[in-house]
A protein has these predicted regions:
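Start-of-helix register in tetratricopeptide repeats
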Residues: 8, 193, 430, 463-467, ...
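Alpha-solenoid helical-repeat scaffolds
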Residues: 311-500, 504-507
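Short coil turns that delineate tetratricopeptide repeat
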Residues: 38, 460, 496, 530, ...
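Structural motif corresponding to the intra-repeat A-B loop/turn of tetratricopeptide repeats
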Residues: 20, 442, 475-479, 512, ...
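Canonical positions in the second alpha-helix
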Residues: 455, 490-491, 524-525, 558-559, ...
């Protein structure tokens, strides 16, 4: 084997053995690697289990057994081994530093291969780093931007990457290079894009830009031109890669090769619609990076920068409601849950920027097949853009001197009453409360967090703190989720004894696996509500997690007496009795749970565990099958394996049931 083909990582070595059919050798290698790294313990355990299954199959072969299903079982074992190897790869790759080609080399290669998306992506990712570029790298970038063979979308993407780079690490030399691109002797398109980038950097690094000698005279012009240029910047950033990708995809859909599998007209249109709604992440990765910058993550700016389109905004909703025959694709685009709001915004901009001839071609091709595709552009795009920009600048208040930026474009045809709740000037407690309640009802959790936090500075009430916690717990921001527990603890200190607060505080501790604190909170809640069956059930569950099974059963029986037939109490009782080995009583309660309408998959898995404890394998398999997903049942047994052994179930019985489920899973496929 040549040196360059020699496998270097554990995954490559395992994969080579699996390809050659050396299952035993591959499993041994996985086990050895997992034994050396404690973080791979769970993968090692699964490898040992797989090894035992393989040994058992070899024993059958050694006895001369010629079961035709042995080959199927071998294929299943091989598939499991591949999944195990992939898990090992996923666990090890993040710990290794990827090889990165120097940016100077990438730029030189880009001049030779201007249409290479791969090179462009690598340059974009490396420019996202905060380090300053060397003189040679800046020179190579200069050559790439001025090269006549570089397509416009590549130039726009490079400038977008430079913008991202400068927002994170101010580089005076790079900024001055940008200024040279704005001079009259440069191509018009490059002048415009460079000005846009310069304005964007100026808004973030105001205190640095105004002291650069070459830019001092232009600084006032930059400030005055910011609204229009920032508008162009967003279009450029969102379109630079997205339009090109759209173009390739559309041509593939419309001008399909006869050699490829022919799609029906309906499938073509459906594919086109799905493509629009799924979003183009390559362009918008810049916006994701910008969220890390303090300027854009500030409470007053982050919402409108990254969520410009939302059905709850009165102006956007009004556009769609104006015309009862609103465009199907635009409505679907706005209502799509698969796309973030900025993706939707970028898709609108891209479609608006499309060449009329291309739009006519799309319409003509689809009409030939009897499909109408009229009115491709969304209604009143300028109205949409005007409202978005008005809210953006009014909300961000980004003028260097602290004055709200105004522009004639923002003033035309605006119904200010629709946007009162968005105004940055809202400070009266009554107005804040109405705004917060509106955002809470519309489930705009990030904005609700900010508004409730502001409201607490004026007045501290139990309801406000509870709603702040609820908004934080539903927010996509991880920092808000971390603060949610602290907010709830503070609420409990200021307003002790509230059942809602104590219940949610206990749930938060349970999710964090802080069972001791959860127990303390539940005991406090029971002092105020001694006979509440829900609190008793939660306390029983908490005690079970702490291995205080006898106390848990006593509490759960008390809860069952308080509210006869409560489903969750019966489920927890069945689980606790199962752990004590009391199969008869556990079976009684699990039957009550499974007799209810639509029991969950977890209920059937627990029922299967209890049946196994009673050595009733057919009943256990019947219950596992009722999860309607053999993989889910198999994983449930695998994750509960220690629990099953602790409950007195023999390991060979567990293994047998898992093998039977795997066999049925394979037959089902």
């Amino acid at each position: 084997m040549a040196d360059k083909d020699k496998p270097t990582t554990t995954y490559e070595k395992v994969a080579r053995r699996l390809v050659n059919g050396q299952l035993q050798s591959a499993l041994t290698l996985i086990s050895k690697q997992c034994a050396m790294e404690s973080r791979l313990y769970s993968i090692g355990e699964e490898a040992d289990t797989l090894q035992k299954d393989y040994d058992r199959m070899l024993d059958f072969l050694a006895k001369g057994t010629h079961d035709p299903k042995l080959q199927e079982q071998h294929d299943i074992l091989l598939e499991r081994a591949w999944r195990l190897a992939e898990s090992l790869y996923d666990a090890q790759v993040p710990a290794k530093l990827p090889f990165e080609e120097p940016i100077l080399t990438l730029l030189e290669r880009l001049l030779a291969e201007p249409d290479s998306d791969k090179l462009l992506n690598q340059i974009f990712e490396q420019l996202a780093e905060s380090r300053q570029l060397t003189k040679a790298e800046r020179k190579a970038m200069h050559q790439a931007l001025l090269d006549e063979n570089i397509p416009e979308y590549v130039r726009a993407t490079l400038l977008s990457a430079i913008t991202l780079h400068l927002t994170q690490s101010f580089d005076a030399r790079m900024v001055e290079d940008l200024y040279t691109y704005t001079l009259d002797d440069q191509p018009v398109q490059l002048q415009m894009q460079a000005w846009i980038t310069l304005v964007f950097v100026a808004l973030i690094h105001t205190h640095r830009i105004e002291h650069l000698p070459r830019l001092r005279e232009q600084y006032q012009f930059i400030c005055e031109s910011a609204p229009d240029l920032l508008f162009n910047l967003q279009i450029a950033l969102l379109q630079c890669r997205e339009a090109f990708t759209f173009d390739k995809k559309l041509h593939k859909i419309i001008d399909q090769d006869g050699e490829e599998e022919e799609l029906s007209e309906q499938e073509r249109v459906r594919e086109f619609f799905e493509f629009i709604t799924e979003g183009i992440d390559t362009t918008l990765s810049m916006f994701s990076h910008l969220k890390k910058i303090s300027f854009f993550s500030a409470e007053g700016t982050r919402h409108h920068w990254f969520e410009p389109f939302c059905l709850e905004q009165p102006d956007i909703k009004a556009i769609l409601d104006e015309n009862p025959k609103a465009l199907p694709w635009s409505r679907m685009l706005l209502q799509s849950v698969a796309q973030c709001n900025t993706d939707k915004y970028g898709s609108f901009l891209t479609m608006q920027a499309y060449n009329k001839d291309l739009m006519a071609t799309i319409s003509e091709k689809l009409e030939e097949k009897g499909m109408k595709f009229d009115d491709i552009l969304p209604p009143s795009p300028l109205y949409v853009m005007r409202n978005y920009l008005h809210d953006l600048f009014r909300y961000c208040n980004m003028h260097p001197k602290g004055q709200t930026m105004r522009h004639p474009l923002f003033e035309r045809d605006l119904d200010m009453s629709q946007n009162k709740w968005l105004s940055a000037g809202v400070s009266h407690p009554d107005q804040l409360k109405k705004t917060a309640e509106f955002l809470f009802r519309k489930e705009r959790w990030d904005e609700a967090c900010v508004t409730y936090a502001t409201l607490l500075k004026h007045e501290v009430t139990e309801e406000t703190m509870q709603k702040l916690y609820y908004s934080m717990s539903h927010s996509e921001s991880s920092s808000d989720n971390r603060k949610a527990l602290q907010t709830l603890i503070k609420c409990n200190v200021l307003f002790p004894g509230n059942k809602w607060t104590l219940r949610h505080l206990a749930d938060a501790y349970h999710e964090a696996e802080e069972y001791q604190f959860e127990g303390q909170v539940l005991h406090e809640a029971l002092e105020h509500h001694p006979d509440d069956p829900t609190l008793l059930m939660r306390l029983g569950r908490c005690l079970t997690c702490q291995d205080r099974i006898d106390e848990a059963i006593e509490i759960l029986y008390k809860a069952d007496i308080q509210k006869e037939g409560q489903l969750r109490v019966h489920r927890e009782l069945a689980n606790a009795l199962f752990l004590t080995g009391d199969h008869t009583r556990a079976e009684k309660f699990i039957r009550m749970v499974l007799s209810r309408p639509e029991p969950s998959g977890d209920d059937f898995i627990l029922g299967g565990h209890i049946a196994l404890q009673g050595e009733d394998i057919p009943l256990a398999l019947e219950r596992y099958r009722k999860t309607d997903d053999y993989t889910y049942a198999y994983n449930g047994i695998l994750s509960d394996k220690k629990k099953l052994i602790r409950a007195g179930i023999a390991e060979n019985i567990i293994q047998l049931v898992m093998e039977l489920l795997l066999r049925e899973l394979y037959n089902e496929k």
